[in-house]
């Protein structure tokens, strides 16, 4: 009975089956819990939120994230207090978009975006470095109150 109803709606033109992809996108139809490509964000002052704690690297099931930490130079007020990533790379081919990296990040530096169309001509293009990840992520304003929001 359900199959006949669907067929009738399709034949009468009530059900739209095909989406003309480059012109039409699914952005408005994505659910709020959709997990797309991971990206890094900066704060409103342009400072990197990532402190190279490497929790996201350790929790990533397919080992798609690699981080090389470095010390912050002595000329800033954050010297010897925090680290920052010298290199931060995510292999988008290996990433399974599980969201564990976003959940474990204590500084809210990595987010899964709504972007679902990631392409490249080679495997090397699919390894996003720190600059590409910050370009995708942009700026995230506000205090880090991740654990207070869940109460």
Where are these regions (language model features)?
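Non-ligating segments of multi-cofactor redox enzymes
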Residues: 1-83, 87-94, 103, 107-151
């Amino acid at each position: 009975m359900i199959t006949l109803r669907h067929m009738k709606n399709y034949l009468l033109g009530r059900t739209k089956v095909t989406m003309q992809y480059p012109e039409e996108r699914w952005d408005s139809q994505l659910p709020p819990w959709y997990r797309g490509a991971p990206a890094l964000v900066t704060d409103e002052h342009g400072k990197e939120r990532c402190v190279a704690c490497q929790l996201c690297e350790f929790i990533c099931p397919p080992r798609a994230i690699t981080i090389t930490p470095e010390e912050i130079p002595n000329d800033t007020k954050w010297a010897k207090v925090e680290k920052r990533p010298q290199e931060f790379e995510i292999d988008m081919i290996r990433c399974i978009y599980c969201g564990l990296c976003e959940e474990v990040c204590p500084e809210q530096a990595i987010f899964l975006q709504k972007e679902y169309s990631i392409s490249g001509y080679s495997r090397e293009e699919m390894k996003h470095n720190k600059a590409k990840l910050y370009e995708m992520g942009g700026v995230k304003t506000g205090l880090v109150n991740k654990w207070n929001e869940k109460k």
